[in-house]
Amino acid sequence: MTRRLVLLALLAVVVASPAGAEHEIFYRYTVLGYVKDAAGKPRPGQTVELIRDKTGFSYLGHTDEAGLFVIVVRLGDESAGESLTLRVGPTQQRLIARFEAANHTEERGTRVDVEGTKVLEHPAAFRATLATLLGAPRP
């Protein structure tokens, strides 16, 4: 009986403890954008790779019929300023993960569009693009 009470007490402590959730905003960094050919037409089915240069971890995404891709990378607060490499076929571009480490309320990320062999980063368009994709009203 005592062993059962100890196990129940331990279970209560484990269940009641806050768990470090991987889905928390301060562990996510989202890179999204569109891949188009040089004429501006969407390139569906393209593989988009985002490499975390510090660790070599590779995150893959694919474009949909509109050429849209979304890649979510696991980056913690300590990763602000970290270098990432975005690759679509032979085209690649170095990115810097820019965010305020203390801000745990706003989504972290950037928008990157690939047009032909040209890569254009639009960090200011990230939140509006994400809100549109999620169907949320823009702030």
Regions found by a protein language model. Name each.
Residues M1-R4:
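Positively charged n-region of N-terminal signal peptides that target proteins for export
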Residues A38-D53:
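Short, ordered, surface-exposed loop/turn motifs in non-cytosolic proteins
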Residues Q93-A102:
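Edge beta-strands of extracellular beta-sandwich domains
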Residues S17-A39, A125-P139:
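Beta-strand-rich domain onsets/edges
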Residues V6-L10:
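N-terminal export leaders
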Residues V70-E82:
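Short Pro-Gly-centered beta-turn/loop motif in secreted/extracellular proteins
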Residues K54-V72:
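Short, acidic Ser/Thr/Gly-rich low-complexity loop/linker segments typical of extracellular
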